[in-house]
Amino acid sequence: MQPVLNIDDVKRVEVGLTRAGVSVSELMHRAGCAVAQEVLELGAKKVVVFCGMGNNGGDGWVCAEALLSRGVDVQVVTPIDPDQLSGDLARQVAQSAVRAGVPALEGPSREEVLETLDEADTIVDCMLGTGFHGTVRTPFDIWIECVNSSDARVVAVDVPSGLSAQSGLAEGPCVIADMTVTMISLKPGLLADAGRDACGVIVVAPLAEQTERLVVEADPVAWRTDLADYLDVVCEPTAAQDKFSRGSVLVVGGSSRFPGAPIMAARAAARAGAGYVTLAVPNTIVPPVQSHLLEIPVVGLPCDVEGVLTAEAAEKVVALAEHNSATLIGPGMRVAGGPVACVNALLRSEAPLVVDADGLNCLARLTENNITEFPELTRREAPLVLTPHRRELGRLVGRADNPPVSLEEQLECARDVVWTDGGSGIVVVAKASATACVGVDQAVMPKPGPAALATAGSGDVLAGMMASYLAQAHGEASDLPLLCALVCEVHGYAGTLAAEAFGTRGVMAGDLIDRIGLAADVIEEHAFVPEGAGEQA
């Protein structure tokens, strides 16, 4: 897995490297040369390097000099005379590059910038680094617009200019790069929100042999998975299995208003490999729900005249859960006294449990929108997986009016939940543009899914898959956050396959379900044989 560090922790690693004998000037030299090497491997012939006035700009000057030494036609665009740079190190490397023969275009107009870019095949963005946040100022806002209007490929250094490497948010114009060469470690902002579209392919340049050790000691905020990491949690089907040994799933949910959500969740659980799936819904919707499910039995539960579960359903739900390997509660269930009672009863049982959608909203009501004040509810021996999107997560931790808006905040809120009881088998699958599967010991980030997943019902499908994989592990996953990440990865690839069939805009949640099995085969195959996995998964 690849570590993800907050910006402050990256700075601490840099301090550790200097104490280990790697000077700041040497780090800048290595960073610039690492970028130059990536540019050379792209086959660049004519390169324009945009340099800012800080150390990120210094990396650009080093890169330009390295490219010139390899015979590349290179030019630097700088806001001021290199001799006027205030930072000693940036000024020194800029002066060195100029002495070596790197031409510099100082304080150009928009027209001059556009003219310079006309014949360039590659642009290197070194305007604003990881310390940037807020609004981009002139001239960099103009330069960013020029870069984004160019047909040349774009390589960003550390972070695309205009993007916060910590939050992943861009308040104004932001460079849209084809590749980002980031130093030392991945940062949260590169992986989520605006960073998803801005960074392109991300390459990590470690800069020193001591980096790996120092990064681990810095306690990464999260870990980004590679396919081979899933080997420990993949449950390979065998010819000796029967439907019972493959695990059984109970899905509880639905209402007269939302009968479709539990249907999708139950079908997804079956497609994800569970040997037996049972769907429990309000009595009033059993006939129409059963008509959509040939392979999945439907059980009726007590409900009111509006087709919402009543408190009397709780006892029956727990009894059903005791006979299944894992239970999912929530899809389409509504928020009322009866559903709240069902969620409460299941939390107090020993059933391996996935809580999604209105199950989470019932949990928020049960805990008065502050789950951290009710540790007894999540303190259980059996696994508990919560799958909130950002708004649902906000409701759980007292931030209903101020839900998390970034991966950074998402991780903080999820940790508030999992640390509530001091340690248990709980995992929060915090869903967003970048999903994090947060356990007590670590947060695991799967490869993010495609834009096609942004459709109603996609979360119901994921929840059904979560329950299915938990059931196949018989509620005893050795690494529950990693298992949850595997499910997210399969879900994402199912979205990719669906988009190939229907187009990104045309995918509906039901299209994902019938591709779950194929997606799982591909992901699991490449987990065992990771070579070339990136070409397909």
What residue ranges belong to the model's regions?
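Internal gly/pro-rich beta-alpha loop/helix module
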Residues: 121-122, 127-220
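Small-residue (G/A/S/T)-rich helix-start motifs and N-terminal tracts that mark the onset
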Residues: 1-79, 86, 190-357, 361-386, ...
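Short acidic loop-to-helix transition motifs that present clustered carboxylates
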Residues: 108-112, 161-165, 188, 360-362
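A short, aliphatic-rich alpha-helical micro-motif
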Residues: 117-121, 147, 174, 321-322, ...
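Short strand->helix junction
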Residues: 83, 129-134, 164, 170, ...
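Nucleotide and nucleotide-moiety/phosphate-recognizing core
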Residues: 37-127, 133-157, 341-342
